[in-house]
């Protein structure tokens, strides 16, 4: 029972976090030579690409929470 509540809460927080994250872009100076992108820049680019799927991810999390309540609720 407690594990169900913990898992339900985790998925709820996950759904909220996915729907509300904002990414800060690093300021680029036009006079500075371009260098290799850092790991942080690559992660930021990946999260920017994943941002298009955030509504689907949030709905998926809510669907999984519903299934947990239906199939594993007492």
Curated annotation (Swiss-Prot):
Specify the domain of life of the species encoding this protein.
Answer: Eukaryota
Keyword Chloroplast part of the UniProt annotation: no
Protein name (Swiss-Prot/TrEMBL) = Protein SMIM7 homolog
- Indicate how the chain sits in the lipid bilayer: Single-pass membrane protein
Please report which protein family the annotation says this sequence is part of. Belongs to the SMIM7 family.
Where is it localised? Membrane
Q: Does the keyword Kinase apply?
A: no
Among PANTHER family, the record links this protein to: SMALL INTEGRAL MEMBRANE PROTEIN 7
GO terms for cellular component: membrane
Listed A to Z, the keywords are: Membrane, Transmembrane, Transmembrane helix
Give the species this sequence originates from. Ixodes scapularis (Black-legged tick)
Q: Where are the transmembrane segments?
A: 53-73
């Amino acid at each position: 029972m407690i594990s169900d509540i913990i898992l339900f809460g985790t998925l709820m927080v996950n759904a909220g976090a996915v729907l509300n994250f904002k990414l800060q872009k690093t300021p680029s100076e036009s006079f500075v030579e371009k260098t290799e992108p850092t790991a942080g820049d690559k992660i930021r680019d990946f999260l920017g690409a994943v941002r298009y799927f955030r509504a689907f991810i949030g709905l998926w999390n809510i669907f999984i929470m519903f299934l947990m309540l239906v199939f594993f609720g007492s």
